[in-house]
């Protein structure tokens, strides 16, 4: 249905959005590629719209496009938080997490590390698990991805859980 609506109206944000969700798997992603390429242009002020295309780009191994989508998603959320005078915890850490992963897939380890550093800095600046569960879960996902994707098992020793945080299940094994 979403693709039918999108084909009739390529400026329909919901049609593009739902097509991306519906075909977010390696075998089906190509069906939503046009939606993915268009969605960010339809809703330029939406950090979610800027990021969503990355779901299709990642499935298709389009890492440069995934990086661009997630950079745009992150920066759009940062600007929105500033403009609305919101706490840092409202920034789009999902885009940041996917940007980190995309850099790892490209072998751009220094860039991935710089993204992980943003996450760590924000956590030190007052984002805690009680005020924002989302931000915290991405810390552990990023750490786990860094260790697994680079096979640098010693990384875990350099990043004990931040004060007040409990490791998530997928990070606990690495700490032992």
Describe these PLM feature segments:
Residues 6-8, 37-45, 75-86, 120-131, ...:
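Solenoid-like repeat scaffolds
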Residues 16-19, 50-53, 91-92, 96, ...:
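TPR repeat positional signature
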Residues 28-29, 63, 109, 153:
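TPR-repeat structural position
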Residues 12, 46, 85-88, 92, ...:
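Residues that mark the junctions of alpha-helical repeat units in TPR/alpha-solenoid scaffolds
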